[in-house]
Amino acid sequence: MAARITNAFTCDVEDYFQVSALAPHFPREQWDSVPCRVERNVDRILALLDGHGARGTFFTLGWLAERYPGLVRRIAAAGHEVASHGYAHQRASDLTPQAFTADIRLAKVILEDITGNAVTGYRAPSFSIGEANLWAHDCIAEVGYRYSSSVYPVRHDHYGIPDAPRFPWRLPNGLVEVPISTVQMLGRNWPAGGGGFFRLLPYALSRWQIARVNAADRRPAIFYFHPWEIDPEQPRVTAATAKTRFRHYINLQHTEARLDRLLSDFSWGRADEVFRDAA
């Protein structure tokens, strides 16, 4: 029998009011006045992982790390990887190279000061590295990150490079890009790595997709989600568009149970360890 493949379990540590789609309703200068729910939700995720003996990677905002350093230390103390999600959840595509570099450097310094460990991984908010700003990979390498997980090789209205490699690749600057998982069907890539699709579609489909990546491609999958996705009690933004409300709030009440099944059905580890020998 073939050995069970260990997949990468990743969590983007941001709160509901920091989501790109809700940015018009929560200006950054007002974030400190908004009730924050991230700590309780991440603690629930840590307990869930511990119950399955699983490890993961937490791509954490520097802004949150400054305000909840104890949470960051708990993540690291439990054996998980603390990686960077930038400082203020600004899309890379909205920044100049100089501003982007400053943002990801600040986040790295904050996280390393809190944990005492090197921070080697980075994920751009909203997978905002696309064909128009591939310069971002050079900035990421320049700051000292070893890998990025910022490209989603799919067609989407807000992100994606549909023809990007489906599996990790090494750039000329030495940086390894670890794209979110997809499956190939009908001549295109389909999302298979979590996020809103994990909530919207039946769990059986996500399970089949990850199993397909493991069995047909013989590769580890990389899965992602956010702490707010297990929090059906979060404040509702009624002023958001119907499309945004649907995408953000659909099936929040079921996500934690689905994660529990996911952790049971597959083997999970940290991205830096799962993809240590990638590319």
Model features per residue range: what roles?
Residues 12, 49, 82-85, 107, ...:
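Conserved, mostly hydrophobic/aromatic
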Residues 117-120, 124-224:
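Active-site-adjacent pocket scaffolds in enzyme catalytic domains
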Residues 201-279:
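C-terminal domain-boundary segment and adjacent tail
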Residues 28-36, 59-61, 88-100, 125-128, ...:
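The substrate-binding groove and active-site-proximal loops of carbohydrate-active enzymes
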Residues 52-133, 145, 150-155, 182:
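Metal-dependent polysaccharide deacetylase catalytic core of the NodB/CE4 family, i.e.
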Residues 42-46, 69-73, 101-108, 137, ...:
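Generic structural signal for well-ordered alpha-helices
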Residues 45-54, 110-117, 215-217, 258-269:
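A structural motif corresponding to the C-terminal end of an alpha-helix
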Residues 2-78:
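Active-site beta->alpha N-cap acidic-glycine motif
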